[in-house]
Amino acid sequence: MSRIGTFADDDLAGWFAKSPDIGGALGGFSQAVYTKNRLPLRTRELARAVIAHRNECVVCVNTRDEDGPAAGVDEELYEHVHEWRTWPGYSEQERLAAEFADRFATAHTALRDDEDFWSRCAEHFSDELLADLALSCALWVGMGRVLRTLDIGQACKLTIPSRG
């Protein structure tokens, strides 16, 4: 049951009306993360899934992208999310994005100071892609924790609509 309002279990956006200006801005930010992101979809989805599990956000864990299958995002990507360090089905870029997401959600200042990590990142990410990854992770950590804390949408599955 939602901690604010009387929203249906599958209503992920109705609560924005409680704060229309900020909620609307957040909706715009979310839209940009999913429609303007330059990260490869597998890389983005693995990072998102890592944070979803860290946040213990049910709807976030259950979210899928309608464009995913065409981009090589299958259920195996999600099934092995806890094995991002070792599962051979992830590319090095995907693994680095997962590491960034995990550490962003749990140890952000240690991540900032890890020169080895940033050297490895420079081999697989441009500054522009790192900016997209960081901003995306900011959305996912914040929104996932808000949804979980306020118990909003925790009984549903979300499919991100196709952009094609």
Feature-to-residue mapping (PLM):
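Mobile cap/lid helix-loop segments that border enzyme active or cofactor-binding sites
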Residues: 1-45, 65-69, 164
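Secretory/periplasmic and organellar redox-cofactor proteins
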Residues: 1-18, 115-130, 136-164
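Alpha-helical scaffold segments that form or flank carboxylate-/histidine-based iron centers
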Residues: 10-14, 41-56, 86, 128-134
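Short acidic alpha-helix initiation/capping motifs at coil-to-helix transition points
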Residues: 21-27, 56-60, 107-115
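Short alpha-helical scaffolding segments that buttress acidic/His motifs in well-ordered protein cores
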Residues: 46-51, 81-82, 97-105, 133-144
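Conserved alpha-helical segments that form or flank metal/cofactor-binding pockets of metalloenzymes
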Residues: 48-79
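Acidic/His metal-coordination segments adjacent to aromatic residues that form catalytic metal sites
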Residues: 83-90
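Acidic/histidine-rich alpha-helical segments that form the ligand environment
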Residues: 91-135
